């Protein structure tokens, strides 16, 4: 029989790293639990309060989430020292010691702007904006007049042949396909361009407000600067009504 060829997707998802053994590996394993299986059982003695084996315990020492202090969501970030193999905290590290893209937090830059300057090398999750769109109720019933120009998502589903014939004995528990429901009070479908125009108008209005506030601030700064300069006057610092003479003496008009 021909040997099964592993697909690239399986090689990525089911990747097994090559294990290396060094002279200091036993020390790291006993002191920091480095290299131990993350799926090993949890130590019940440690959870009850004290484990006599300490760091030499072959089981996991996991603190109770109810008694441990909150980490502020840091356990969803990958430990940068662990990526380089230099983390000394081991299982007690508040960061994630696992490189799993499904557990990465969402990239805020990609979410706001629709692109990321780091591209495929970004360590955070890039979610397609199309996946956030709600499903089109007209398409779910069987037909959307706007077709691919609809602003909502068109999800293809297999229809139940028994439901199309008039009756499905399994009802809502049917596994043969979807049961489209008819409704007469649906909102009119909208085009993609209309939603884009509304979004562009909102962005333009916000930009105009920022420009207006910037201009007002510039005018206030200019008025304040002119008021300070006018208060001291031009010549002599007294509105031009006198002259300074030698040795600090001041001679006003008429003297």
Curated annotation (Swiss-Prot):
Highest taxon listed in the record's lineage: Eukaryota
MF GO annotations: RNA binding; zinc ion binding
Entry-linked SMART domains: ZnF_C3H1
GO cellular component, one term: nucleus
Bias (Basic residues): 238-255
Disulfide feature: none
Main location: nucleus
One Pfam assignment: zf-CCCH
Keywords: Metal-binding, mRNA processing, Nucleus, Repeat, RNA-binding, Zinc, Zinc-finger
Basic and acidic residues biased stretches: 179-227
Subcellular location: Nucleus
Gene3D superfamilies reported for this sequence: Zinc finger, CCCH-type (4.10.1000.10)
PROSITE patterns: ZF_C3H1
ZnF start-end (C3H1-type): 37-64, 73-100, 101-129, 130-157, 159-182
GO process terms (BP): mRNA processing
Keyword Nucleotide-binding: no
Region (Disordered): 179-255
Key word Zinc present: yes
SUPFAM superfamilies associated with the record: CCCH zinc finger (SSF90229)
Function field: Component of the cleavage factor I (CF I) involved in pre-mRNA 3'-end processing.
Family: Belongs to the CPSF4/YTH1 family.
Protein name: mRNA 3'-end-processing protein YTH1
Annotated source species: Gibberella zeae (strain ATCC MYA-4620 / CBS 123657 / FGSC 9075 / NRRL 31084 / PH-1) (Wheat head blight fungus)
Name of the gene this protein is made from: YTH1
């Amino acid at each position: 029989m021909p040997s099964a060829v592993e697909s690239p997707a399986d090689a990525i998802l089911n990747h097994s790293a090559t294990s290396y053994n060094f002279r200091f590996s036993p020390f790291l394993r006993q002191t920091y639990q480095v290299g131990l299986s993350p799926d090993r059982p949890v130590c019940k003695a440690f959870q009850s309060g004290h484990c006599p084996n300490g760091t030499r315990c072959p089981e996991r020492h996991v603190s109770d989430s109810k008694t441990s202090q909150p980490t502020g969501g840091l356990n969803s970030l990958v430990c940068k020292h662990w990526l380089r193999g230099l983390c000394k905290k081991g299982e007690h590290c508040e960061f994630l010691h696992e490189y799993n893209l499904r557990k990465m937090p969402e990239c805020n830059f990609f979410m706001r702007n629709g692109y990321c300057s780091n591209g495929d090398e970004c360590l955070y999750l890039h979610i397609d904006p199309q996946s956030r769109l709600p499903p089109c109720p007209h398409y779910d019933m069987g037909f959307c007049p706007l077709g691919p120009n609809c602003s909502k998502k068109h999800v293809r589903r297999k229809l139940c042949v028994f439901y199309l014939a008039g009756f499905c004995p399994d009802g809502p528990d049917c596994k043969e396909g979807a049961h489209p429901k008819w409704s007469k009070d649906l909102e009119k479908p909208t085009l993609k361009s209309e939603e884009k125009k509304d979004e562009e108008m909102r962005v333009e209005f916000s930009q105009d407000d920022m420009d207006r506030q910037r201009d007002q601030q510039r005018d206030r700064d200019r008025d304040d600067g002119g008021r300070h300069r006018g208060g001291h006057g031009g010549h002599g610092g007294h509105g031009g009504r006198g002259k300074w003479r030698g040795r600090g003496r001041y001679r006003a008009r008429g003297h």
